[in-house]
Amino acid sequence: MGLGRKFVLGAVLVVTGLALSAGGCALQRLPNVSAEVTGPPASPPVLAAFQSDPAIQSLSDWQDRRAPLLKARFQSEIYGAMPATVGYEIISRYVLEKPEKGAIGTIERLTIALKTAEAGPWTGGRPVVDLILMTPKGKGPFPVIAGGTFCGNDALLPKQTGTRTTTMALPPECGGGAPGFLVTAIFGKYANAPPWETLAQRGYALASWHPGDVVPDVAEVAEPYLAALTPIGTLPEQRTGAIAAWAWTSSRILDVLGDDPRLDARRMLLWGHSRHGKAALLSAAFDPRPAAVWALQSGTAGAALGRDDVGEPVADITRAFPHWFAPSYASYAAKQADLDIDQHQLIALLAPRPVLIGTGRRDQWGDPHGSFRALKGADPVYQLFGQQAFTQTKLRHPDGKGVLAFYMRPGLHGIHTEDWTEALSFFDRTVPKAVPNTPNSGLKP
């Protein structure tokens, strides 16, 4: 066998292996998921008595009693303590590109130092994040879609060469050549970069960063970074997990975006795929500023109910990714039904803001049914806020009603044209925005 064929075969084997482990998935189960809703309702009922707190009777009961209790419980049992909010400093800012053609106005790179309560193992003692910000042509302030990238901003900006736009080592699958091409082929056209031009045409700005700049996504490496972000006095079993650290990073990025007069601080939208979908939901649960959230295939400890027998068990995810969570979460590996909180309660903490949950029909490991029932389980809190009831009955396309929505497109774990089509339609419907700059700004397959 020639060297070229050996290289391609090796790349195929590498990426096939990645397909079996992407997004926190230990396996990819291939049968199609039924579009008919199955499984029991989310438990415990979101307004029922919880621990020593009596049943919720009013919106003030939820806001004053239940929401703080749930936030404390999610930190102690699943995600770990949220890091303290200190501030940020923009170290540098410069324009990468100002295209003459198309709807994109400016693409900028910002180097941002995040201030932390304690110095850590980062170079200079504090995390430094490279932020790419695209603003469209036209008159602002613009709504901005903000989310992390798996492979850093070099993958987001394929035309840019030279200085790496991330301070941490990237996994090998993020390299160029055949492996990088196959990652995109398997995980979707937009696995590395969102549809820039389409977002600009629709009037949205885009903000992207690499969460691994704050906590690297490697269990053996992450611990000292997590220790530095964990608030002093936190119990060891409640040590900050990487999901919480990445959620905190999202909020710090919103600090930066909210101070930019070209952007509308009332229309900052968070999104994330897989582990970053978990972080987007958690960030918005603790931060009231995201106007809407899109979580794509966020799975266990994301949108999927933890008590389901379908999907990724706590035992598997905490064994494969122990750094993502508080150490206490692993104690439920053999008894996950004993955990008294579940993900419908996390989604309820986002009320009354719009939430879109996306899944793939062959991503059974991500538990589409459990994610749908989690939305249904959060709905009573949304109704407390006066929002329209969640009326969707099938795991297909959103019914166009209310601010809770779910879709299931064909395929596996990845980011595809259908995902961005659903997300932009949802944002257009639920978050007021300016008239699009140009007509016919739909996505091309």
Predicted regions and their residues:
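C-terminal catalytic histidine-bearing segment of alpha/beta-hydrolase fold enzymes
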Residues: K376-N440
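Bacterial N-terminal signal peptides that target proteins for export
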Residues: G2-A11
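Conserved strand-to-loop "acid loop" that flanks and positions the catalytic carboxylate
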Residues: A351-G366, P410
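Bacterial N-terminal signal peptides
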Residues: G10-S21
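N-terminal targeting or regulatory segments adjacent to alpha/beta-hydrolase or S9 domains
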Residues: G24-D130, G138-K139, P158-T163, N440
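Mobile cap/lid helix-loop segments that gate and shape the active-site cleft of serine hydrolases
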Residues: A295-L346, D367, S371-Q392
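Cap/lid segment of the alpha/beta-hydrolase catalytic domain
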Residues: G148-R252, V256-D259, G299, L305-R307
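Primarily recognizes the serine-hydrolase "nucleophile elbow" in alpha/beta-hydrolase
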Residues: R252-E312, D316, K335-Q336
